Protein backbone atom coordinates (compact mmCIF):
# COMPACT_ATOMS: atom_id res chain seq x y z
CA UNK A 1 0.00 0.00 0.00
CA UNK A 2 1.39 3.37 -0.93
CA UNK A 3 2.93 5.68 1.64
CA UNK A 4 0.83 8.58 2.89
CA UNK A 5 -2.46 7.46 1.35
CA UNK A 6 -3.99 8.91 4.52
CA UNK A 7 -2.51 12.26 3.52
CA UNK A 8 -4.16 11.98 0.14
CA UNK A 9 -7.54 11.03 1.59
CA UNK A 10 -7.47 13.69 4.26
CA UNK A 11 -6.47 16.46 1.87
CA UNK A 12 -9.38 15.60 -0.38
CA UNK A 13 -11.98 14.96 2.32
CA UNK A 14 -11.78 18.14 4.38
CA UNK A 15 -14.38 20.75 3.53
CA UNK A 16 -13.73 24.47 3.64
CA UNK A 17 -16.00 27.31 2.61
CA UNK A 18 -15.39 28.08 -1.06
CA UNK A 19 -15.74 31.20 -3.10
CA UNK A 20 -16.43 31.83 -6.74
CA UNK A 21 -14.00 33.56 -9.07
CA UNK A 22 -15.11 35.64 -12.01
CA UNK A 23 -12.56 37.42 -14.19
CA UNK A 24 -12.88 41.15 -14.57
CA UNK A 25 -11.72 42.43 -17.94
CA UNK A 26 -10.64 45.94 -18.79
CA UNK A 27 -9.22 47.55 -21.91
CA UNK A 28 -5.55 48.46 -21.85
CA UNK A 29 -4.32 51.31 -24.11
CA UNK A 30 -0.54 51.25 -24.10
CA UNK A 31 1.22 53.02 -26.97
CA UNK A 32 0.40 52.21 -30.58
CA UNK A 33 -0.53 48.57 -29.89
CA UNK A 34 -4.19 47.60 -30.29
CA UNK A 35 -6.21 47.31 -27.08
CA UNK A 36 -5.83 43.98 -25.28
CA UNK A 37 -7.98 42.48 -22.58
CA UNK A 38 -6.37 42.62 -19.15
CA UNK A 39 -7.67 40.30 -16.45
CA UNK A 40 -7.20 41.71 -12.96
CA UNK A 41 -5.99 39.25 -10.33
CA UNK A 42 -4.45 39.63 -6.90
CA UNK A 43 -1.81 36.90 -7.01
CA UNK A 44 -0.32 35.02 -9.96
CA UNK A 45 1.72 31.88 -9.38
CA UNK A 46 3.79 30.83 -12.39
CA UNK A 47 4.45 27.10 -12.20
CA UNK A 48 1.94 24.43 -11.24
CA UNK A 49 4.37 21.84 -9.89
CA UNK A 50 4.56 20.67 -6.29
CA UNK A 51 5.70 23.97 -4.80
CA UNK A 52 3.53 26.20 -6.99
CA UNK A 53 0.43 24.11 -6.27
CA UNK A 54 1.19 24.12 -2.53
CA UNK A 55 1.57 27.91 -2.66
CA UNK A 56 -1.82 28.28 -4.36
CA UNK A 57 -3.43 26.03 -1.77
CA UNK A 58 -1.80 27.95 1.08
CA UNK A 59 -3.49 31.13 -0.16
CA UNK A 60 -6.80 29.41 -0.91
CA UNK A 61 -7.05 27.79 2.52
CA UNK A 62 -6.06 30.95 4.42
CA UNK A 63 -9.09 32.83 5.83
CA UNK A 64 -7.19 36.09 5.36
CA UNK A 65 -6.94 35.55 1.59
CA UNK A 66 -10.45 34.20 1.12
CA UNK A 67 -11.59 37.16 -1.00
CA UNK A 68 -8.41 37.37 -3.09
CA UNK A 69 -8.24 36.09 -6.63
CA UNK A 70 -5.49 33.54 -7.20
CA UNK A 71 -4.30 32.37 -10.62
CA UNK A 72 -2.07 29.31 -11.09
CA UNK A 73 -0.26 29.09 -14.43
CA UNK A 74 1.12 25.80 -15.75
CA UNK A 75 3.15 25.55 -18.95
CA UNK A 76 2.47 21.83 -19.44
CA UNK A 77 -0.49 20.64 -21.49
CA UNK A 78 -1.71 17.99 -19.05
CA UNK A 79 -1.69 17.19 -15.34
CA UNK A 80 -0.37 14.00 -13.69
CA UNK A 81 -2.86 11.16 -13.44
CA UNK A 82 -2.69 8.90 -10.39
CA UNK A 83 -4.11 5.39 -10.33
CA UNK A 84 -3.64 2.53 -7.88
CA UNK A 85 -3.07 0.24 -10.85
CA UNK A 86 -0.22 2.30 -12.30
CA UNK A 87 3.39 1.31 -11.53
CA UNK A 88 5.21 3.42 -8.99
CA UNK A 89 6.72 6.57 -10.43
CA UNK A 90 10.50 7.05 -10.35
CA UNK A 91 10.00 10.61 -9.06
CA UNK A 92 9.56 10.56 -5.29
CA UNK A 93 10.41 12.81 -2.37
CA UNK A 94 11.00 12.34 1.34
CA UNK A 95 8.62 14.69 3.14
CA UNK A 96 10.14 15.94 6.37
CA UNK A 97 8.25 17.06 9.47
CA UNK A 98 8.08 20.71 8.40
CA UNK A 99 6.52 19.78 5.07
CA UNK A 100 3.97 17.59 6.84
CA UNK A 101 3.25 20.60 9.06
CA UNK A 102 2.42 22.58 5.93
CA UNK A 103 0.00 19.93 4.70
CA UNK A 104 -1.67 19.92 8.10
CA UNK A 105 -2.51 23.60 7.65
CA UNK A 106 -4.57 22.44 4.66
CA UNK A 107 -6.20 19.70 6.77
CA UNK A 108 -6.57 20.87 10.36
CA UNK A 109 -9.28 18.31 11.15
CA UNK A 110 -6.93 15.36 10.58
CA UNK A 111 -3.52 16.14 12.13
CA UNK A 112 -0.83 13.56 11.47
CA UNK A 113 0.41 11.38 14.32
CA UNK A 114 3.35 10.10 12.31
CA UNK A 115 6.69 10.54 14.10
CA UNK A 116 8.85 9.05 11.33
CA UNK A 117 11.92 10.87 10.12
CA UNK A 118 10.30 11.22 6.71
CA UNK A 119 7.51 9.86 4.54
CA UNK A 120 8.41 8.69 1.04
CA UNK A 121 5.74 9.75 -1.44
CA UNK A 122 5.53 9.87 -5.22
CA UNK A 123 5.58 13.40 -6.60
CA UNK A 124 2.54 12.70 -8.75
CA UNK A 125 0.52 11.58 -5.73
CA UNK A 126 1.33 14.78 -3.83
CA UNK A 127 0.55 17.01 -6.79
CA UNK A 128 -2.68 15.18 -7.53
CA UNK A 129 -3.79 15.67 -3.91
CA UNK A 130 -2.96 19.37 -3.99
CA UNK A 131 -4.77 19.95 -7.28
CA UNK A 132 -7.80 17.96 -6.12
CA UNK A 133 -7.95 20.09 -2.99
CA UNK A 134 -7.64 23.29 -5.05
CA UNK A 135 -10.74 22.33 -7.03
CA UNK A 136 -12.77 22.77 -3.85
CA UNK A 137 -11.73 26.41 -3.93
CA UNK A 138 -12.58 26.72 -7.63
CA UNK A 139 -8.91 27.03 -8.55
CA UNK A 140 -7.51 24.96 -11.39
CA UNK A 141 -4.19 25.41 -13.18
CA UNK A 142 -4.38 27.23 -16.49
CA UNK A 143 -2.63 24.75 -18.75
CA UNK A 144 -0.39 25.75 -21.67
CA UNK A 145 0.13 29.09 -19.92
CA UNK A 146 3.69 30.37 -19.73
CA UNK A 147 4.84 33.89 -18.96
CA UNK A 148 6.30 35.43 -22.12
CA UNK A 149 7.27 38.72 -20.49
CA UNK A 150 6.13 41.10 -17.79
CA UNK A 151 6.44 44.80 -17.04
CA UNK A 152 5.80 47.01 -14.06
CA UNK A 153 2.87 49.39 -13.94
CA UNK A 154 2.00 51.88 -11.23
CA UNK A 155 0.38 49.44 -8.79
CA UNK A 156 0.72 46.10 -10.51
CA UNK A 157 2.67 43.88 -12.86
CA UNK A 158 1.29 43.26 -16.33
CA UNK A 159 1.98 39.76 -17.58
CA UNK A 160 1.90 38.72 -21.20
CA UNK A 161 1.31 35.03 -21.73
CA UNK A 162 2.53 33.02 -24.69
CA UNK A 163 -0.17 32.22 -27.26
CA UNK A 164 -2.87 34.12 -25.36
CA UNK A 165 -4.60 37.36 -26.19
CA UNK A 166 -5.49 38.16 -22.58
CA UNK A 167 -2.89 39.80 -20.36
CA UNK A 168 -2.87 39.55 -16.59
CA UNK A 169 -2.58 42.49 -14.24
CA UNK A 170 -1.46 41.14 -10.90
CA UNK A 171 -0.59 42.59 -7.54
CA UNK A 172 2.03 39.91 -6.87
CA UNK A 173 3.89 37.53 -9.18
CA UNK A 174 5.31 34.39 -7.58
CA UNK A 175 7.85 32.50 -9.69
CA UNK A 176 7.70 28.74 -9.12
CA UNK A 177 8.84 27.82 -12.62
CA UNK A 178 11.84 25.65 -11.78
CA UNK A 179 15.60 25.96 -11.63
CA UNK A 180 15.73 27.21 -15.23
CA UNK A 181 13.25 29.93 -14.28
CA UNK A 182 12.45 32.21 -17.20
CA UNK A 183 10.93 34.74 -14.80
CA UNK A 184 14.17 34.91 -12.83
CA UNK A 185 16.01 35.50 -16.10
CA UNK A 186 13.56 38.22 -17.20
CA UNK A 187 14.01 39.95 -13.85
CA UNK A 188 17.79 39.74 -14.36
CA UNK A 189 18.32 38.17 -10.96
CA UNK A 190 21.82 36.73 -10.82
CA UNK A 191 22.63 33.37 -9.25
CA UNK A 192 25.43 31.54 -7.50
CA UNK A 193 25.74 28.13 -9.14
CA UNK A 194 28.10 25.37 -10.09
CA UNK A 195 28.00 22.00 -11.79
CA UNK A 196 28.86 18.94 -9.67
CA UNK A 197 29.93 16.96 -12.76
CA UNK A 198 27.62 14.28 -11.43
CA UNK A 199 24.36 12.71 -12.51
CA UNK A 200 21.51 11.40 -10.41
CA UNK A 201 20.13 8.09 -11.66
CA UNK A 202 16.62 7.20 -10.51
CA UNK A 203 14.59 4.03 -10.94
CA UNK A 204 11.78 2.09 -9.29
CA UNK A 205 13.11 -1.14 -7.77
CA UNK A 206 11.36 -4.48 -7.30
CA UNK A 207 12.37 -6.29 -4.10
CA UNK A 208 12.72 -9.97 -3.26
CA UNK A 209 9.55 -11.54 -1.84
CA UNK A 210 11.14 -12.86 1.35
CA UNK A 211 12.19 -9.44 2.66
CA UNK A 212 10.92 -8.14 6.05
CA UNK A 213 8.84 -4.96 6.32
CA UNK A 214 10.41 -2.40 4.03
CA UNK A 215 10.27 0.70 6.23
CA UNK A 216 13.92 1.77 6.38
CA UNK A 217 15.71 4.06 3.93
CA UNK A 218 19.23 2.94 3.03
CA UNK A 219 22.09 5.14 1.91
CA UNK A 220 25.67 4.12 1.26
CA UNK A 221 28.46 6.57 0.54
CA UNK A 222 30.70 5.26 -2.20
CA UNK A 223 33.85 6.86 -3.64
CA UNK A 224 31.81 7.54 -6.79
CA UNK A 225 28.91 9.13 -4.88
CA UNK A 226 26.04 8.14 -2.56
CA UNK A 227 23.44 5.52 -3.46
CA UNK A 228 20.07 5.54 -1.69
CA UNK A 229 17.16 3.11 -1.56
CA UNK A 230 13.90 4.69 -0.34
CA UNK A 231 10.99 2.44 0.73
CA UNK A 232 7.70 2.68 -1.16
CA UNK A 233 6.05 -0.59 -0.08
CA UNK A 234 7.05 -4.09 0.99
CA UNK A 235 7.66 -4.93 -2.66
CA UNK A 236 9.10 -1.70 -4.10
CA UNK A 237 11.70 0.95 -3.33
CA UNK A 238 12.95 4.02 -5.14
CA UNK A 239 16.58 4.40 -6.22
CA UNK A 240 18.61 7.61 -6.22
CA UNK A 241 22.23 6.96 -7.26
CA UNK A 242 24.75 9.77 -7.63
CA UNK A 243 27.55 8.97 -10.06
CA UNK A 244 30.22 10.90 -12.02
CA UNK A 245 29.34 12.05 -15.52
CA UNK A 246 31.85 9.57 -16.92
CA UNK A 247 30.02 6.68 -15.24
CA UNK A 248 26.36 7.54 -15.82
CA UNK A 249 26.30 6.70 -19.54
CA UNK A 250 27.67 3.23 -18.85
CA UNK A 251 25.03 2.54 -16.21
CA UNK A 252 22.23 3.88 -18.38
CA UNK A 253 23.27 1.63 -21.28
CA UNK A 254 23.26 -1.59 -19.23
CA UNK A 255 20.45 -4.08 -19.56
CA UNK A 256 17.98 -4.20 -16.66
CA UNK A 257 19.59 -7.41 -15.37
CA UNK A 258 23.08 -5.90 -15.47
CA UNK A 259 21.86 -2.69 -13.85
CA UNK A 260 20.22 -4.62 -10.99
CA UNK A 261 23.47 -6.53 -10.43
CA UNK A 262 25.37 -3.23 -10.18
CA UNK A 263 22.87 -1.87 -7.63
CA UNK A 264 23.15 -4.94 -5.38
CA UNK A 265 26.94 -4.82 -5.66
CA UNK A 266 26.98 -1.12 -4.76
CA UNK A 267 25.01 -1.80 -1.56
CA UNK A 268 26.80 -4.93 -0.37
CA UNK A 269 30.17 -5.47 -2.03
CA UNK A 270 33.48 -4.70 -0.31
CA UNK A 271 34.97 -3.70 -3.64
CA UNK A 272 34.16 -0.06 -2.82
CA UNK A 273 35.90 -0.11 0.56
CA UNK A 274 39.35 1.39 0.92
CA UNK A 275 41.46 -1.35 2.49
CA UNK A 276 43.87 1.12 4.04
CA UNK A 277 41.18 2.64 6.23
CA UNK A 278 39.50 -0.56 7.45
CA UNK A 279 42.20 -1.47 9.98
CA UNK A 280 42.34 2.12 11.28
CA UNK A 281 38.59 2.19 11.79
CA UNK A 282 38.55 -1.19 13.55
CA UNK A 283 41.36 -0.20 15.93
CA UNK A 284 39.59 3.03 16.92
CA UNK A 285 36.29 1.19 17.38
CA UNK A 286 37.84 -1.45 19.66
CA UNK A 287 39.51 1.31 21.71
CA UNK A 288 36.32 3.25 22.44
CA UNK A 289 34.39 0.03 23.19
CA UNK A 290 36.85 -0.63 26.03
CA UNK A 291 36.25 2.84 27.44
CA UNK A 292 32.48 3.08 26.95
CA UNK A 293 30.27 -0.02 26.99
CA UNK A 294 27.90 -0.16 24.06
CA UNK A 295 24.76 -2.21 23.65
CA UNK A 296 25.04 -4.92 21.01
CA UNK A 297 23.26 -4.06 17.79
CA UNK A 298 21.73 -6.37 15.24
CA UNK A 299 23.18 -5.78 11.82
CA UNK A 300 20.59 -5.10 9.18
CA UNK A 301 21.07 -5.82 5.51
CA UNK A 302 19.73 -3.68 2.69
CA UNK A 303 16.90 -5.17 0.63
CA UNK A 304 17.73 -7.50 -2.24
CA UNK A 305 16.82 -5.99 -5.60
CA UNK A 306 15.47 -8.46 -8.16
CA UNK A 307 14.36 -6.14 -10.97
CA UNK A 308 13.44 -2.60 -11.93
CA UNK A 309 10.14 -1.33 -13.27
CA UNK A 310 10.24 -1.06 -17.08
CA UNK A 311 11.18 2.38 -18.39
CA UNK A 312 11.66 3.75 -14.86
CA UNK A 313 15.41 4.35 -15.22
CA UNK A 314 16.30 8.01 -15.84
CA UNK A 315 19.21 10.39 -15.24
CA UNK A 316 19.55 14.12 -14.62
CA UNK A 317 22.56 16.43 -14.09
CA UNK A 318 23.28 17.70 -10.58
CA UNK A 319 23.95 21.36 -9.91
CA UNK A 320 23.88 23.79 -7.01
CA UNK A 321 22.03 27.06 -7.50
CA UNK A 322 21.02 29.95 -5.29
CA UNK A 323 19.46 33.19 -6.51
CA UNK A 324 21.17 36.27 -5.11
CA UNK A 325 17.75 37.82 -4.59
CA UNK A 326 14.51 36.08 -3.70
CA UNK A 327 12.41 39.25 -3.83
CA UNK A 328 11.86 42.26 -6.04
CA UNK A 329 8.97 44.75 -5.98
CA UNK A 330 5.80 42.66 -6.42
CA UNK A 331 7.89 39.61 -7.33
CA UNK A 332 9.17 36.65 -5.28
CA UNK A 333 10.97 33.42 -6.12
CA UNK A 334 10.10 30.12 -4.45
CA UNK A 335 11.23 26.52 -4.84
CA UNK A 336 13.80 25.62 -7.48
CA UNK A 337 13.42 29.08 -9.01
CA UNK A 338 15.23 30.36 -5.92
CA UNK A 339 17.51 27.45 -5.01
CA UNK A 340 18.59 24.00 -6.12
CA UNK A 341 20.38 21.54 -3.86
CA UNK A 342 22.26 18.24 -4.17
CA UNK A 343 19.77 15.35 -3.72
CA UNK A 344 21.89 13.37 -1.24
CA UNK A 345 19.81 14.54 1.76
CA UNK A 346 16.45 14.73 0.01
CA UNK A 347 15.95 18.39 0.93
CA UNK A 348 15.02 19.92 -2.45
CA UNK A 349 11.23 19.93 -2.37
CA UNK A 350 11.23 20.32 1.42
CA UNK A 351 13.07 23.61 1.02
CA UNK A 352 10.42 24.65 -1.50
CA UNK A 353 7.63 23.80 0.93
CA UNK A 354 9.57 25.77 3.55
CA UNK A 355 9.41 28.77 1.20
CA UNK A 356 5.64 28.37 0.96
CA UNK A 357 5.22 28.20 4.74
CA UNK A 358 7.45 31.24 5.31
CA UNK A 359 5.84 33.36 2.58
CA UNK A 360 2.24 32.67 3.57
CA UNK A 361 3.01 33.50 7.21
CA UNK A 362 4.62 36.82 6.28
CA UNK A 363 1.89 37.85 3.83
CA UNK A 364 -0.83 36.93 6.33
CA UNK A 365 0.87 39.26 8.80
CA UNK A 366 0.83 42.01 6.18
CA UNK A 367 -2.93 41.58 5.79
CA UNK A 368 -3.38 41.67 9.58
CA UNK A 369 -1.36 44.88 9.65
CA UNK A 370 -3.67 46.40 7.05
CA UNK A 371 -0.72 46.83 4.69
CA UNK A 372 -0.25 46.05 1.01
CA UNK A 373 0.68 42.36 1.07
CA UNK A 374 2.89 42.85 -2.01
CA UNK A 375 4.89 45.61 -0.32
CA UNK A 376 8.63 45.15 -0.72
CA UNK A 377 8.99 45.58 3.04
CA UNK A 378 7.29 42.23 3.63
CA UNK A 379 8.81 40.51 0.60
CA UNK A 380 12.31 41.44 1.76
CA UNK A 381 11.49 39.91 5.15
CA UNK A 382 10.71 36.66 3.32
CA UNK A 383 13.99 36.96 1.40
CA UNK A 384 16.01 37.58 4.55
CA UNK A 385 14.57 34.60 6.39
CA UNK A 386 14.80 32.15 3.52
CA UNK A 387 18.21 33.24 2.25
CA UNK A 388 19.63 32.65 5.72
CA UNK A 389 18.08 29.20 6.05
CA UNK A 390 18.48 27.99 2.47
CA UNK A 391 22.05 29.16 1.97
CA UNK A 392 23.12 27.46 5.20
CA UNK A 393 21.49 24.23 4.08
CA UNK A 394 22.87 24.45 0.54
CA UNK A 395 26.41 24.89 1.80
CA UNK A 396 26.14 22.23 4.51
CA UNK A 397 24.90 19.61 2.02
CA UNK A 398 27.56 20.72 -0.45
CA UNK A 399 30.19 20.25 2.27
CA UNK A 400 28.84 16.77 3.06
CA UNK A 401 29.01 15.87 -0.61
CA UNK A 402 32.63 16.98 -0.76
CA UNK A 403 33.42 15.15 2.49
CA UNK A 404 32.07 11.88 1.13
CA UNK A 405 33.60 12.39 -2.31
CA UNK A 406 37.19 12.42 -1.08
CA UNK A 407 39.40 9.31 -1.09
CA UNK A 408 41.96 10.83 1.32
CA UNK A 409 42.48 7.98 3.82
CA UNK A 410 42.49 9.98 7.11
CA UNK A 411 39.22 11.70 6.14
CA UNK A 412 37.66 8.39 5.07
CA UNK A 413 38.65 6.80 8.39
CA UNK A 414 37.35 9.76 10.41
CA UNK A 415 33.93 9.80 8.75
CA UNK A 416 33.62 6.01 9.05
CA UNK A 417 34.42 6.14 12.76
CA UNK A 418 31.95 8.98 13.26
CA UNK A 419 29.08 7.07 11.66
CA UNK A 420 29.96 3.89 13.56
CA UNK A 421 30.10 5.81 16.83
CA UNK A 422 26.61 7.25 16.33
CA UNK A 423 25.20 3.90 15.20
CA UNK A 424 26.46 1.99 18.25
CA UNK A 425 25.28 4.45 20.91
CA UNK A 426 21.50 4.22 21.06
CA UNK A 427 21.03 7.40 23.12
CA UNK A 428 23.04 9.45 20.64
CA UNK A 429 21.22 7.88 17.71
CA UNK A 430 17.84 8.60 19.31
CA UNK A 431 18.88 12.22 19.90
CA UNK A 432 19.73 12.77 16.23
CA UNK A 433 16.56 10.98 15.16
CA UNK A 434 14.47 13.19 17.44
CA UNK A 435 16.10 16.32 16.05
CA UNK A 436 15.51 15.18 12.48
CA UNK A 437 11.85 14.42 13.21
CA UNK A 438 11.27 17.72 15.00
CA UNK A 439 8.46 19.83 13.59
CA UNK A 440 9.81 23.12 14.87
Residue ranges of each PLM-predicted region?
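Glycine-rich FAD pyrophosphate-binding loop
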Residues: 44-46, 58-89
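N-terminal mitochondrial targeting presequence
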Residues: 1-39
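N-terminal FAD cofactor-binding segment of flavoenzymes
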Residues: 83-105
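C-terminal helical "tail/cap" subdomain of flavin- and related membrane-associated enzymes
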Residues: 297-301, 361-440
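Beta1/beta-strand and adjacent pyrophosphate-binding region of the FAD-binding site
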Residues: 33-51, 71
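Conserved N-terminal helical subregion
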Residues: 35-40, 105-186, 192-204
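Conserved FAD-binding catalytic core of PHBH/FMO-like flavoproteins
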Residues: 164-165, 173-298, 310-313, 327
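Short FAD-binding loop at a beta-strand-to-alpha-helix junction that anchors the flavin cofactor
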Residues: 325-343
Amino acid sequence: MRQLLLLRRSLISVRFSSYSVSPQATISHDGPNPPTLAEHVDITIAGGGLVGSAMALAFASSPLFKSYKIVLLESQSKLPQVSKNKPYSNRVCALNAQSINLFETFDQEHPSENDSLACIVENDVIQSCLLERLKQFHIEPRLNSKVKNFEYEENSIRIKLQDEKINLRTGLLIAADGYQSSIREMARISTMQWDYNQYGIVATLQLADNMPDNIVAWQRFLPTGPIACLPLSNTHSSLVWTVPKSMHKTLMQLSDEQFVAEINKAFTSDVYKQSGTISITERIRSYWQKLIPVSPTTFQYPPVIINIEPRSRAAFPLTLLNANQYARPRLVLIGDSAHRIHPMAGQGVNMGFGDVLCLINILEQAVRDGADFSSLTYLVDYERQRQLQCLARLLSIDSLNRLYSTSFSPIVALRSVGLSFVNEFSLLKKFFAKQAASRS
